[in-house]
Amino acid sequence: MTGLPFRIGYGEDAHRLAPGLPLVLGGVAIPHAELGAVAHSDGDAVLHAVADALLSGLALGDIGQYFPDTAAEWKGMDSRRILAKALELVEERGYRPVNVALVVTLDRPKLGPLRADIAASVAELLGLPAGEVGVSFKTSEGLALEHVQTRVTVLLGRVDD
């Protein structure tokens, strides 16, 4: 295998929120959410950002290239499929995720009680120990009450043959 032993990827995603829609973050349904993501897929901003981080680490573009929001076939799609495709592309090139750090900005509901669930879900989807997925939560301090945003950094390691 050739190439750098490590690569760093960065991903970001945001969705407007509206009443009557589910809110899913990191593959976890968020209970008691009054607002949910407005999106072509299920609107999981965490998994979208993780997928983009995986792709950017190897200069493979972004999820919009693989799952355009103009294609009817992706309407309502479970974002775990998006992440699985990004992971497949990374693994095909001889890399795997080593560590993930993610920050979710959301004013309400408070997500602290779900930190371990979100970390465990993302870790499982990536084949990592839960301790390799760091999850932080922030608020917008009232600046943007009706949106969710996620920023993610991923460390990719080359898999030696």
Curated annotation (Swiss-Prot):
Keyword list, A-Z: Isoprene biosynthesis, Lyase, Metal-binding
PROSITE patterns referenced in this protein's UniProt entry, alphabetically: ISPF (PS01350)
Catalytic activity: 4-CDP-2-C-methyl-D-erythritol 2-phosphate = 2-C-methyl-D-erythritol 2,4-cyclic diphosphate + CMP
Molecular function via GO: 2-C-methyl-D-erythritol 2,4-cyclodiphosphate synthase activity; metal ion binding
UniProt: a divalent metal cation binding residues: 13, 15, 48
InterPro entries in the record: MECDP_synthase (IPR003526), MECDP_synthase_CS (IPR020555), MECDP_synthase_sf (IPR036571)
Site (Transition state stabilizer): 40, 139
Cofactor, free-text remark: Binds 1 divalent metal cation per subunit.
Superkingdom field: Bacteria
Pathway given in the UniProt record: Isoprenoid biosynthesis; isopentenyl diphosphate biosynthesis via DXP pathway; isopentenyl diphosphate from 1-deoxy-D-xylulose 5-phosphate: step 4/6
Record-listed E.C. numbers: 4.6.1.12
Gene Ontology terms describing biological process: isopentenyl diphosphate biosynthetic process, methylerythritol 4-phosphate pathway; terpenoid biosynthetic process
Binding, 4-CDP-2-C-methyl-D-erythritol 2-phosphate: 13-15, 40-41, 62-64
Listed cofactors: a divalent metal cation
Statement: the UniProt record of this protein carries the keyword Transport: no
One Pfam match: YgbB
Cystine pairings recorded for this chain: none
Function text: Involved in the biosynthesis of isopentenyl diphosphate (IPP) and dimethylallyl diphosphate (DMAPP), two major building blocks of isoprenoid compounds. Catalyzes the conversion of 4-diphosphocytidyl-2-C-methyl-D-erythritol 2-phosphate (CDP-ME2P) to 2-C-methyl-D-erythritol 2,4-cyclodiphosphate (ME-CPP) with a corresponding release of cytidine 5-monophosphate (CMP).
Subunit structure: Homotrimer.
Family named by the database record: Belongs to the IspF family.
Protein name: 2-C-methyl-D-erythritol 2,4-cyclodiphosphate synthase
Native organism: Deinococcus radiodurans (strain ATCC 13939 / DSM 20539 / JCM 16871 / CCUG 27074 / LMG 4051 / NBRC 15346 / NCIMB 9279 / VKM B-1422 / R1)
